């Protein structure tokens, strides 16, 4: 697998055109939650963004998330793939049912409407993330993807969570590492 080399070349080719420093990190652990934690620890900005690398959510939609924070509509912007119609092969039927179930369950448990707990696109302020991390021991380290950890943590802190609808597309890069049955 030459993924790391491809990433290094892509950064070298694009760094001069980017207004931001482009950084690639190799995580010491496994899973998305570990990758997000490593990335957030290295990030220098006041706003932290999670966007899955398969680009099934267009990065052009990220300003909607940041605007939701800036306009004080929320303190935690959570992507929802279950609002707009999605491409035919973007999500399997059982995954749609599971995502809807978790949305109803979390809405009930957290007392805030949440349609899609497992959308990979999430945005929050660093100060709020740092508070979630400081309270992480309360729920434990049970979530290999980090979505539930962030949502439970945000709710426990009383943060206003708001869904931001996204246009979910079929994955065009790579293959999923998530098993519908062993990962839920």
Where are these regions (language model features)?
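Catalytic donor-sugar/metal-binding loop of nucleotide-sugar-dependent glycosyltransferases
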Residues: 139-140, 151-169
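Acidic donor-binding segment of Leloir-type glycosyltransferases
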Residues: 1-25
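Acidic donor-binding/catalytic loop of UDP-sugar-dependent glycosyltransferases
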Residues: 2-6, 51-68
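Acceptor/aglycone-binding surface of glycosyltransferases and processive sugar-polymer synthases
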Residues: 20-22, 27-42, 47, 59-140, ...
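Structural element of the ATP-grasp superfamily
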Residues: 7, 105, 129, 150-154
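Residue-level signature of catalytic and energy-coupling elements of molecular machines
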Residues: 39, 54, 125, 154, ...
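Active-site phosphate/pyrophosphate- and oxyanion-stabilizing loops and adjacent acidic/basic residues
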Residues: 5-8, 37, 63, 152
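Cofactor-binding loops of NAD(P)H-dependent oxidoreductases
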Residues: 25-28, 51-53, 164
